[in-house]
Amino acid sequence: MKKELYIGLDVHREAVAIAVAEQGRKGEVRDYGQISNDLHALERFITRLRQTHGKRVTLRACYEAGPCGFGVARRLQQLGVECAVVAPSLTPTRAGDRLKTDKRDARKLARLLRAGELSAIYIPEPTDEAIRDLCRARSDAVDDRRRSRNRLKAFLLRHGYRCQESERGKHQELFH
């Protein structure tokens, strides 16, 4: 039987907390520690894990979706690791788990991945993600423009300048 290891990652901007769970219900969940959040450190970690447990070991990893995006998942998949990204809102929690630390989160993810209790989200292709980012940036710019225009109108109104009904369509001249 092939050996399987389940890796829980708590990914942040600067560092990644790692826990590794061995297969089997009674398999131990060990804290690996923290590595810096860069792709070379991640590659060194996977290489070291394979050297320790043998090249035939199956590695499965997961982390919660967040602002760091899908780069970690894509790199792990390139290295031959099955990687799942899970929505934090769909991660089961126990009633007493109030204290959150990076180490505990990594351990919990490794344990839940081994138990099969996590549901992965779709990891978009880089081109799809780029289009999504561009659409979000445009939407943010449109919202910022509207808010700025409303702030300026409120400022002018506070200082006695009223916008007449017939002039409302001419605001383009003021703001461009």
Write out the residue ranges for each language-model feature:
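Short alpha-helix plus adjacent loop in nuclease-associated cores
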Residues: Q77, A84-R136, D140, H171-H176
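Short, well-ordered alpha-helical microsegments
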Residues: G69-A73
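Short, basic/hydrophobic alpha-helical segments
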Residues: L39-R60
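Short glycine-rich, Thr/Ser-proximal phosphate-binding strand/loop in the N-terminal lobe
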Residues: E14-A41
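Short, glycine/acidic-enriched loop or turn micro-motifs at the edges of active sites
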Residues: R13, P67, L90
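Acidic beta-strand-to-loop metal/phosphate-binding motif
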Residues: G8, R56-G66, L109
